[in-house]
C-alpha cells in the first residue's frame, strides 16, 4: 500500500487540506482495480537493490549515486529495464544511465529560467513518470503533486521515489478530470504536452485556472503552428502518427485563448522546433520515435504532410 498520510500532513493548513485528506481512499480504490501489467511492473520494483544515495543532484539533472559494486549496478539496470519503455528523462541512478526517448532536460532548461518555484505548491498535469516533478523540487518547490493515469509512468515514478523518500513529491495515478472543481490551492500549475490531446481546449484552460490560487501562475507547453491569431491547425486524421491530436494553434491564437479564458500577463517565453536529437528511440525505448513520424525527405513536415512539431511555452497569471 502507498501511504499518502505524509502528503496530507504536508498540505495541512493549506487550501488543499480537505482534498488531500480524501486522497488515500481514492488511491486505494484505484489500486484495487489495478492494471493487467501491474504485477509484472511491481516485480521489477521489488527487484531494485536496497541502497541509499549519498549524493543527490536534482538541480543539474536527476542523478543519485553512492558507493556500490558492479553486481548492484547490474541488478539496478535489469530492474529498471523491466519498466521500459522510458519516455521522459534522462535519469542517472547509481551509475545506470537511463537514456530515455525524450531529452526532457533540454525542455526543462528552456522553461526553468522563466519561473520562480521557490516555496510553491505545484500541480503537474499529465506528469508522466515524474521527471519534471523532481526538477521542480530541485528548483525549491514546497510540494509537487502530479496526476497521470498511466500505470507504467506511476511505477517508474515509484522506482525513483524509493531512493528519494521525499514527503514533498507525489504521483497520483488519476486523470486530471478526477480533481474536484474549484480547488484553487496551487501556486503554479504545469500542463506540458497535454493541451493538444484535449478536444475542448478552452475547457482545459478553465479547469487549469480553477486549480490556481488568485495570482497563481500557469505554465502551458504545447504544439503550435506558425501564423496570426486566426491560425489554428486541426488535423484531418493523424498528426505525426498520433490519432488524438485536436488543436494546434499559432502562438498569437493561443495567447488570445488564454486571455479569453481569464488569464492575464500572458507571455510566450520559448518556441522550439523538436529535433530528432531531442526525441528519439534508445535501448530504453525501442519503439518508433520522431524520425519515423517525419517526412523522410523533408523534416519540416510530418509523414502526413503537416508542419513538423514545434512547441511553445506560455506563462500566464490567474
Swiss-Prot record:
Any Pfam family: Methyltransf_9
Enzyme class: transferase
InterPro entries reported for this sequence: CmoB, Mo5U34_MeTrfas-like, SAM-dependent_MTases_sf
Signal sequence coordinates: none
GO biological process: tRNA wobble uridine modification
Catalysed conversion reaction: carboxy-S-adenosyl-L-methionine + 5-hydroxyuridine(34) in tRNA = 5-carboxymethoxyuridine(34) in tRNA + S-adenosyl-L-homocysteine + H(+)
EC assignment: 2.5.1.-
Binding site for carboxy-S-adenosyl-L-methionine: 88, 102, 107, 126, 192, 196, 311
GO molecular function: methyltransferase activity; transferase activity, transferring alkyl or aryl (other than methyl) groups
Keywords, alphabetical: Transferase, tRNA processing
Subunit-level organization: Homotetramer.
Function comment: Catalyzes carboxymethyl transfer from carboxy-S-adenosyl-L-methionine (Cx-SAM) to 5-hydroxyuridine (ho5U) to form 5-carboxymethoxyuridine (cmo5U) at position 34 in tRNAs.
Family: Belongs to the class I-like SAM-binding methyltransferase superfamily. CmoB family.
The protein's name: tRNA U34 carboxymethyltransferase
Species per Swiss-Prot/TrEMBL record: Pseudomonas fluorescens (strain ATCC BAA-477 / NRRL B-23932 / Pf-5)
Organism lineage: Bacteria, Pseudomonadati, Pseudomonadota, Gammaproteobacteria, Pseudomonadales
Gene symbol of the encoding locus: cmoB
Amino acid at each position: 500500500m502507498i501511504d499518502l498520510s505524509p502528503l496530507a500532513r504536508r498540505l495541512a493548513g493549506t487550501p488543499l487540506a480537505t482534498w488531500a485528506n480524501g486522497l488515500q481512499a481514492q488511491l486505494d480504490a484505484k489500486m484495487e482495480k489495478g492494471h493487467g501489467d501491474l504485477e509484472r511492473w511491481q516485480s521489477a520494483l521489488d527487484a531494485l537493490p536496497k541502497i541509499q544515495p549519498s549524493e543527490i543532484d536534482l538541480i543539474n539533472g536527476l542523478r543519485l549515486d553512492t558507493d556500490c559494486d558492479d553486481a548492484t549496478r547490474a541488478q539496478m539496470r535489469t530492474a529498471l529495464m523491466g519498466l521500459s519503455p522510458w519516455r521522459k528523462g534522462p535519469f542517472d541512478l547509481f551509475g545506470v544511465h537511463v537514456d530515455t526517448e525524450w531529452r526532457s532536460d533540454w525542455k526543462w532548461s528552456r522553461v526553468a529560467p522563466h519561473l520562480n518555484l521557490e516555496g510553491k505548491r505545484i500541480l503537474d498535469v499529465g506528469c508522466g513518470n515524474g521527471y519534471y516533478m523532481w526538477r521542480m523540487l530541485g528548483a525549491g518547490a514546497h510540494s509537487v503533486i502530479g496526476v497521470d493515469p498511466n500505470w507504467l509512468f506511476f511505477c517508474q515514478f515509484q522506482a525513483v521515489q524509493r531512493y528519494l523518500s521525499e514527503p514533498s513529491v507525489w504521483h497520483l495515478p488519476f486523470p486530471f478530470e478526477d480533481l474536484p472543481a474549484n480547488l484553487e490551492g496551487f501556486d503554479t500549475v504545469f500542463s506540458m504536452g497535454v493541451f493538444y490531446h484535449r478536444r475542448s481546449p478552452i475547457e482545459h484552460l478553465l479547469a487549469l485556472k480553477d486549480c490556481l490560487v488568485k495570482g497563481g501562475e500557469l505554465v502551458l507547453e504545447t504544439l503550435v503552428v506558425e501564423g496570426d491569431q486566426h491560425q489554428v491547425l486541426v488535423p484531418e486524421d493523424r498528426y505525426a502518427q498520433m490519432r488524438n491530436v485536436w488543436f494546434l494553434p499559432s502562438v498569437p491564437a493561443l495567447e488570445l485563448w488564454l486571455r479569453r479564458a481569464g488569464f492575464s500577463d500572458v507571455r510566450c517565453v520559448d518556441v522550439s522546433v523538436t529535433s530528432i536529437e531531442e526525441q528519439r528511440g534508445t535501448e530504453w525505448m525501442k519503439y518508433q520515435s520522431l524520425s519515423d513520424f517525419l517526412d523522410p525527405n523533408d523534416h519540416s513536415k510530418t509523414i502526413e504532410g503537416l508542419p513538423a512539431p514545434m512547441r511553445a511555452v506560455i506563462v500566464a497569471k490567474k
